[in-house]
A protein has these predicted regions:
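Generic structural signal for well-ordered alpha-helices
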Residues: 8-16, 40-51, 76-81, 128, ...
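Glycine-rich phosphate-binding active-site loops on the catalytic face of alpha/beta enzymes
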Residues: 26, 90-100, 146, 153-180
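Glycine/Thr-rich beta-alpha phosphate-binding loop at enzyme active sites
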Residues: 29-38, 76, 81-137
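C-terminal helical cap(s) of enzyme catalytic domains, especially alpha/beta-barrels
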Residues: 100-117, 170-195
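Active-site beta->alpha loop and helix N-cap motifs at the rims of alpha/beta catalytic domains
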Residues: 1-23, 28
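Short beta-strand/loop segments at the ligand-binding rim of alpha/beta enzyme cores
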Residues: 56-69, 133-143
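Active-site glycine- and acidic-residue-rich loops that bind
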Residues: 1-9, 36-38, 42, 64-85
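Catalytic cores of alpha/beta
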Residues: 71-85, 132-137, 147-164
Length: 207
């Protein structure tokens, strides 16, 4: 599109009355130049426009931003600042990765496309923890990347995620994985004497 920001605004206008929340995805590796929105000026312009559109619609729809895992320390700090300056409810950490392929064994590891699941779990977890420390509970964190068990989900909560999402785990284990994770989480919470998830969110720090 010649006006990519307007594409997002049209989506908000069309769906703000029916959606539970709207994701501003700036991180798909399969969409040309989409990750340019991680640049400070471009992201600020986008989220300012999104906030103004919400206000013009008198809408309370939560807006969350989905980021790439392939970002550096400077980008982490800038993104955190920009999120806090705008009417943003959450951040999804993270989309698929274009790096981390050298750890794979499959001969097709260098094919084009986003890498998901276990190979990006550590990168996702580190980012969750960094953003948790910067956002200080003011913006909700949705953790994604390598969730395939109650333990892997629990780890993301400990590092600062308020919610989790999964896809690759469901591909390999089927939709019943949600019930398995729920059961495992209940056992882990009981084991640790935890009565509410809020007690464990952000209790662990990665160096």
């Amino acid at each position: 599109s010649d006006n990519r920001i307007n594409d997002y605004l049209i989506g908000i206008e069309k769906f703000h009355e029916v959606a539970d929340y709207i994701t501003i995805n700036i991180s798909s590796p399969n969409t040309e130049n989409l990750r340019n929105f991680h640049d400070e000026r471009k992201l600020q312009d986008l989220l300012k426009s999104v906030s103004e559109k919400k206000k013009s619609l008198d809408s309370n729809i939560p807006i969350v931003v989905k980021i790439s895992p392939d970002i550096d320390e400077n980008q982490i700090n800038l993104i955190s600042e920009i999120l806090l300056e705008n009417d943003i409810s959450g951040i999804i950490i993270s989309n698929t990765s274009e790096s981390s392929r050298d750890i794979l064994k499959n001969i097709q590891r260098h094919q084009k496309g986003g890498l998901s699941g276990k190979p990006i779990e550590k990168k996702s977890n580190l980012l969750i923890n960094k953003f948790y420390n910067l956002l200080k509970g003011k913006i909700k964190i949705i953790g994604v990347g390598g969730v395939d068990s109650g333990q892997s989900a629990y780890e993301k909560f400990l590092l600062g995620a308020d919610y989790i999402q999964l896809y690759t785990g469901m591909v390999f284990q089927g939709p019943n994985i949600a019930s398995i994770i729920k059961k495992d989480l209940k056992e882990l919470l009981t084991r640790d004497g935890v009565k509410n998830f809020s007690e464990i969110i952000g209790n662990k720090t990665l160096s």
